[in-house]
């Protein structure tokens, strides 16, 4: 079989779509490309099973629509697999209507991702897609579909498909019972890893790449997170296997920084084994590790161990400085945990990146001011190196979406509008201008004298200078973004 893992170009005046490996979709004015771990694992699985595989990321390769179509047509695929998200799903429906039957009459088209997992019937009705693979283990499901070769009796749970008579069928709710240790290491050459090795705001040192020790978050209860739709169950790889892969990436590809993009990096015994092995092999001196983490679980000693093991950047979701919001989001987090955890991590020598969300339906001026004050205080005290502000987007499939929809708390159900360029959550206690002004105030926190001095004091190498230079460019852009209602992140 001939399998294409494809990201069609999505030309738009809004910018470059940040689609792959992204829990929250954004349009960026400056290109940012994140290595898509599960699609790359799927491609590697297909190649290992003896199939011909085409990795065709028209977004990261910055291909024209014509060039993308030419390459796809020349490959003559049996299956075309496309990852989609809420703000671009209508564009992918249109793409499917235009391309179905164009390349090969028997080509099967497959959609994956959190939106189609939440609303599979919608996409089956609005596009000629042949398969929807629901859940986060769609790489395993793709292998199953291809090996079944049209025999639906062999399909695993979680697959939506069209029967011979055109009717829509499905195999029930997906299960996350696949052994992650059975998945091969990603074939980085097959998946053109260099496309994603430089243009990424997380990396201080390049080339960099991504992997995932777990799928996805050991908390998995935050009501706003779109990936809880994909991964309601948490599993991890063997920590020794993860370290083996890191060693391989360092030796064979010269990788200098690795982002472990598990929703939350595994803690407990996994972290102990991982850190001790990184130190024992001397990898802590050869590569920097970045990861996502949650406040309230690790101690100051844990952060010191991480730093010794080669960790550089730790990303935390704060969302709000108000306990009522943290509780409504089921963050299982106290406000005091935020400042304590960030203090411990930064004192251990880790770079701390914090994410904040604005535009919660139940927050007014005072609550917004609390979050602004916390964010600026974290920068001023050096507890945060970088931060990110986004507008609240309740994605289909999340409890937050269900809650707001039932309460008539959404401004629209037009999925194109769920791209964070403007609010889709009704905020009766604060105007959109007040929310934008608050976000600008947070970003101006980078210009506080104490924050600037800390940046200068930590700039020691050319890597640091380049990293902070990119950050300044982003900061200026985001101050303009929120003046005009656009949004982005700040590194």
Locate each region found by the language model.
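Radical SAM enzyme core and accessory elements
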Residues: 2-5, 69-72, 78, 199, ...
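Short glycine-rich His-centered loop
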Residues: 3-31
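Flexible glycine/acidic-rich beta-alpha junction loops that bind and position SAM and/or redox cofactors
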Residues: 12-16, 120, 268-269, 324, ...
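Glycine-rich beta-alpha loop elements in corrinoid/cobalamin-binding modules
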Residues: 38-176, 397
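Residue-level recognition of beta-strand->loop/alpha-helix junctions
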Residues: 55-59, 229, 356-358, 391
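Catalytic cores of alpha/beta
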Residues: 121-126, 302, 362-377
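Radical SAM [4Fe-4S] cluster-binding motif and immediate context
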Residues: 181, 186-353, 360, 370-373
């Amino acid at each position: 079989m001939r399998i294409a893992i494809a990201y069609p170009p999505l030309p738009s005046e809004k910018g470059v779509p940040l689609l792959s490996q992204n829990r929250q979709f954004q349009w960026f004015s400056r290109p940012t490309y994140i290595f898509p771990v599960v699609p790359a694992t799927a491609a590697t699985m297909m190649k290992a099973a003896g199939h011909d595989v085409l990795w065709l990321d028209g977004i990261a390769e910055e291909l024209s629509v014509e060039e993308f179509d030419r390459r796809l047509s020349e490959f003559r695929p049996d299956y075309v697999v496309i990852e989609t998200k809420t703000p671009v799903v209508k564009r992918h429906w249109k793409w499917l209507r235009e391309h179905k039957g164009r390349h090969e009459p028997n080509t099967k088209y497959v959609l994956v991702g959190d939106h189609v997992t939440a609303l599979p019937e919608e996409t089956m009705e609005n596009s000629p897609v042949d398969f929807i693979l629901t859940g986060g283990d769609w790489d395993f499901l793709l292998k199953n579909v291809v090996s079944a070769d049209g025999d639906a009796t062999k399909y695993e749970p979680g697959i939506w498909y069209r029967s011979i008579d055109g009717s829509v069928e499905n195999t029930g709710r997906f299960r996350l019972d696949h052994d992650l240790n059975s998945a091969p290491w990603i074939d980085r050459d097959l998946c053109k890893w260099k496309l994603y090795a430089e243009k990424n705001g997380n990396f201080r040192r390049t080339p960099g790449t991504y992997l995932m020790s777990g799928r996805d978050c050991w908390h998995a209860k935050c009501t706003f997170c779109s990936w809880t739709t994909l991964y309601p169950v948490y599993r991890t790889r063997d920590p020794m296997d993860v370290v083996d892969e890191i060693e391989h990436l360092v030796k064979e590809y010269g990788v200098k920084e690795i982002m472990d993009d598990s929703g939350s990096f595994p803690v407990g015994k996994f972290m102990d084994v991982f850190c001790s092995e990184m130190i024992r092999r001397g990898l802590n001196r050869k590569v920097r590790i970045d990861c996502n983490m949650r406040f309230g679980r690790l101690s100051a000693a844990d952060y010191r161990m991480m730093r010794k093991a080669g960790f550089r950047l730790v990303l935390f979701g704060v969302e709000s400085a108000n306990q009522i919001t943290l509780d409504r989001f089921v963050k299982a987090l106290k406000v005091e945990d935020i400042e304590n955890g960030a203090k411990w991590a930064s004192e251990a020598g880790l770079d701390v990146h914090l994410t904040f969300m604005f535009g919660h339906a139940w927050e007014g001026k005072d609550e917004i001011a609390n979050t602004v004050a916390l964010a600026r205080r974290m920068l001023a005290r050096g507890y945060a190196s970088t931060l990110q502000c986004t507008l609240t987007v309740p994605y289909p499939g999340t409890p937050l979406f269900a809650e707001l929809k039932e309460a008539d708390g959404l401004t629209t159900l037009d999925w194109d509008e769920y791209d964070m360029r403007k609010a889709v959550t009704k905020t009766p206690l604060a105007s959109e201008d007040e929310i934008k002004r608050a976000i600008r105030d947070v970003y101006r926190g980078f210009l506080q004298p104490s924050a600037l001095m800390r940046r200068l004091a930590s700039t020691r190498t050319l890597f640091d200078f380049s990293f902070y230079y990119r950050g300044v460019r982003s900061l200026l852009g985001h101050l303009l973004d929120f003046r005009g209602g656009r949004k982005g992140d700040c590194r």
